[in-house]
Amino acid sequence: MQTIYTKITDIKGNLITVEAEGASLGELVQIERADGRSSYASVLRFDARKVTLQVFGGTSGLSTGDKVIFLGRPMEVIYGDSLLGRRFNGTGKPIDHEDECFGEPIPITTPSFNPVCRIVPREMVRTNIPMIDMFNCLVKSQKIPIFSSSGENHNALLMRIAAQTDADIVIIGGMGLTFVDYNFFVEESQRLGFADKCVKFIHKAVDAPVECVLIPDMALACAERFALEQQKNVLVLLTDMTAFADALKEIAITMDQIPANRGYPGSLYSDLAVRYEKAVDIAQGGSITLISVTTMPGDDITHPVPDNTGFITEGQFYLKDNRIDPFGSLSRLKQLVIGKKTREDHGDLANALIRLYADSRKSAERMSMGFKLSNWDKKLLAFSELFEARLMSLEVNIPLEEALDIGWKILSQSFHSEEVGIKEQLIQKYWPKACLHK
């Protein structure tokens, strides 16, 4: 039996307080307004009989005498094949002007996958982006963010990864998107040809922050069901997790919580971790690979959001100057696939290229300070130009094997074979024959 309450004692921002009994955290609530409209809310906090609710869609037009009905179940989202190709807002309602979506309602707040049923990641996810495939391999079921400096086109990188991987289903969770960003996701997924296997959960910048915090939960709840019940390999793309954290901060301030670092709630680490831990490779088949975007305000890597994220995830891609910076990027799972799922020369070649590129940066610094350059410095500078143009540029779109071959060609055009520090047996097998004795 549902109990109806009509005594709203406080309205503050998107939060209301009502006197009620028997409420549970996360419980879904229906609010019936005097003008006949209805909206939903969820239980955020309770203290004795005072229950705080976060209202989806805002509290505009709400009065203290409106009916509040506790539904006895958590927030749910529709799951099923009918989701594919569709777009939904932060409350799970379609926003693509198509028919109502039908399927199985599932709760959006579920525990992380049972560790006993997880398996060690072992499959490489190919993106055809050399700075990922060659130097920081993406592994199936990995959770990894893209740390993006201001002004970087991280959304284009996300869509390119989505189009060029072999994921069965792509789920995009957009938070705090401008109309331009939202339109880009819609049009780009159609242009790249994966719109029919893509589900989009979208929170726009003009929407209530309460809806923003639901986006990752809805995206990951659906991904978990697709992976578990249909054995699908699901790629989840979340952008922007800084907007997600800002929404948490706004809600916490409205609730008069004591802030922690830079105004963010003390639960920020846990709030991020519980979402990232949904990434999984399931023993019975199916997987969830999670790539997020975390913008860094003021390019500050010590900002609470990227700082906490770095302790949770399995590496990061550092997007800077329209390139993936090799020195700020890391994949903690790459050793599981390099040389095991890729060519034998992969590890040695990648290490040599990065080592020489690091040396070239020192030579460039000496040149900028007016020091006289040695012949070795000149070789390094010539090498860095080739390396940046043929492997680092995000315009490059080639398979891993071709990237490895190009890496050998760049080395042979810049150095003698004995100068690169690679094992002789690999030199004999892969060094371009025309340059073998150079």
Swiss-Prot record:
Keyword Transport carried by entry: yes
GO biological-process terms attached to the record: proton motive force-driven plasma membrane ATP synthesis
GO MF assignments: ATP binding; proton-transporting ATP synthase activity, rotational mechanism
Assigned keywords, A-Z: ATP synthesis, Hydrogen ion transport, Ion transport, Transport
InterPro entries attached to this UniProt entry: ATP-synt_VA_C, ATPase_F1/V1/A1_a/bsu_N, ATPase_F1/V1/A1_a/bsu_nucl-bd, P-loop_NTPase, V-ATPase_su_B/beta
Function summary: Produces ATP from ADP in the presence of a proton gradient across the membrane. The V-type beta chain is a regulatory subunit.
Xref: NCBIfam families: PRK02118.1, PRK04196.1
Stated family: Belongs to the ATPase alpha/beta chains family.
Protein name: V-type ATP synthase beta chain
Source organism (scientific name): Chlamydia trachomatis serovar L2 (strain ATCC VR-902B / DSM 19102 / 434/Bu)
